[in-house]
Amino acid sequence: MAIRINNINLSLDDDLNVLEKKICKKLNMSKEDISRLDIIKRSIDARKKNDIKVSFSVNVFCKKEKMLLSRIHDKDISFEEIREIESIKSGTEEIKARPVVVGFGPAGIFAALTLARYGYKPIVYERGEDVDKRTETVEKFWKDGRLNLESNVQFGEGGAGAFSDGKLTTRIKDHRCSFVLDELIKAGAPAEIKYESKAHVGTDLLKGVVKNIREEIKRLGGEVNFNSKLEKITYKDGKLESIVVNGKNITCEALVLAIGHSSRDTYEMLYRENVSMDAKAFAIGVRIEHPQELINVNQYGNNHNHPKLHAADYRLTYQSEKLKRGVYSFCMCPGGVVVAAASEEGRLVSNGMSYHARDLDNANSALVVTVSPEDFKGSSPLRGMEFQRHYESLAFKLGGGNYKAPVQLVGDFMKDRVSTKLGEVIPSYTAGYEFRELKECLPDYVVEALKEGIINFDKKIKGYAREDAILTGIETRTSAPVRLNRNASLESINVCGLYPTGEGAGFAGGIISAAVDGIKVAEHIIEKFDLPK
């Protein structure tokens, strides 16, 4: 039990001693009465740019909390129940083979870690390379355009998030989120991810964190195999029996399917095997780049160079009444770069990435428009995937091949003309670019909605619609185009023992929610099955 205090505001120049004094004053106690103080959340309140505050939420541990709280009447002070992940009792159903985890992104990593902690010794199969070899492969692709179809920005140890920003924000309310953060810190992530309101690890640090968790899984008896691709599943009478990995048939009764949102060949295999799935909504658009200083000044005003203020971010939304579509920023990367993120030959994809320091010149974000199954041709549950492929192919051709991206300045995009020269903002896309009209690789309604959104967002961030801001095509992998349907026990509704998990299954979005989903799936497996013999 702890006392939670919210909305403790400090100035930018205050140190943590001021925080402690304010806590003692609120609770009418001395600092000697406090046995422990945990910072739960730290955020920047920049609503008044001439008086920016650092806002804290804390948990205070002391003697006689209830007695103390009974005499304090403050809406920002309450009891906080400290909930730990409860120990799970193993089930009784016999399992002949060790559980298998396919995919080693956030969902697969935390499913495997949870299973390993409980003695289930999972076997992991990841189609891509380990994170060190994968990094070499990806950097080579960015340099010479040679795409490895099995190991790239989408596939390999760490998942797609390993080449993003390592963002740890989430909207889900689940006590497992705290466990995920604790495990990341144990594995080498900075301690502040536990309380920063917009926490991130950064691509550079995340790689080491992932390797350390892999070694922990192995220490606990798990097995992690790279360059190992799931090719087929076999089930009988609605019950999973085996899988094929790299041509080898493997007995399997419990399969955590954590394939990520870009494993299109796996989706196709599952569709052929009649695994229940549906098309789902997602969003497509472009990457937009501005000078990071412009965003900093807009968000922080004259304080934008203060040492306690990091590179500013933004989150923008707009609803087009005319088009009945949402336009929004997504995966905003302060001080980052736009990266080539393809995973199929002849199809172009862009994404954003930041290192931990977020200290590069440009701010970039996806600028995307919602699309739904009604926009996709046909009736197949894979029709959203084919929709993505169509526009990615157009973008590839528009860029001239070799994974160069089509680029257009915002001013030219708004006026439907090809750009001919750059302004202050230099495109950061890692595989080169060509000036092209982006309307040639996007649906007309997406182009129109983007134009509306840019005008609206310029009212919120002055300079958002500046003539020389950069648009890079195209962003299509905002979320999975498919949902793999599952029941209350988190199994496929028509294949017992198959556990669709994380972002690729359509049940998560981002590192934390995917990791939590992986833990929940592992818990269901543990509760169902006895330890493998």
UniProtKB/Swiss-Prot annotation:
Q: What range does the record give for the signal peptide?
A: none
- InterPro entries attached to this UniProt entry: FAD-binding_protein, FAD-depend_C, FAD/NAD-bd_sf, FAD/NAD-binding_dom
The source's domain of life comes to Bacteria
Name a Pfam family for this protein: Pyr_redox_2
One Gene Ontology molecular-function label: oxidoreductase activity
PANTHER family given in the database record: FAD/NAD(P)-BINDING OXIDOREDUCTASE, FAD_NAD(P)-BINDING OXIDOREDUCTASE FAMILY PROTEIN
Q: Name the chain's protein.
A: Uncharacterized protein Cbei_0202
The species is Clostridium beijerinckii (strain ATCC 51743 / NCIMB 8052) (Clostridium acetobutylicum)
Q: What is the lineage of its organism?
A: Bacteria, Bacillati, Bacillota, Clostridia, Eubacteriales
